[in-house]
Regions:
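A residue-level detector for the "anchor" residue at the start of short, highly conserved motifs
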Residues: 1-174
Length: 174
């Protein structure tokens, strides 16, 4: 898979043996992570324009295997981040990980990360002017049913960034 997906997988047995369910994560036309599902609810964020693949376990258990020979067993409430050939496991904000599925944008990240999410959701191109803030961190919640102007206006309330919408392009400046 490429992109983002939420999975609810039931434990299945056939002839007394557990039947595995696998999700393969593809990046640059190459399998970089394989998730073996052991009866669970989990989310995978694996967009090609993101530097990391994030897998968040809501409940149950999953086993991750990367092309870099890393194997990890996640426990409920944990997330793995695969990037630069390493898997990092940490406690997850599960609400934030599946907010998209529940119709919300939840941000606790830098401006470029937020803008990549907006670009995907609204199918727009993001253009940064030289005056765009470089290290602006954003936090907040807004409904995904909001139109793009509402979302951009909420972010502009920080007073540290300005947006201009020109057709399918969002111009970002200070």
């Amino acid at each position: 898979m490429t992109g983002e997906g939420y999975f609810e997988v039931a434990h299945v047995e056939r002839n007394g043996n557990r039947v595995p369910f696998f999700v393969s994560v593809i990046k640059n036309q190459e399998q970089v992570e394989k998730v073996e599902v052991l009866g669970t609810h989990f989310n995978i964020n694996a967009y090609t324009n993101e530097s990391r693949i994030e897998t968040t376990l809501i409940n149950g258990s999953i086993k991750l295997a990367s092309k870099y020979n890393h194997n990890v067993l996640l426990k409920p409430g944990e997330m793995s981040k695969l990037g630069n050939g390493k898997i990092e496991v940490k406690q997850a904000d599960t609400e934030m990980a599946i907010a998209w599925k529940n119709g919300a944008f939840v941000f606790r990240e830098d401006l470029p990360s937020v803008m990549r999410k907006i670009a995907r959701w609204y199918d727009v191109e993001i253009v940064y002017q030289q005056t765009a803030p470089e290290n602006l961190m954003l936090g907040g919640w807004i409904s995904r049913s909001s139109n793009i102007s509402e979302v951009l206006n909420h972010i502009q309330l920080t007073g540290k960034v300005h947006f201009k919408l020109e057709g399918r392009r969002v111009i970002v400046s200070r």
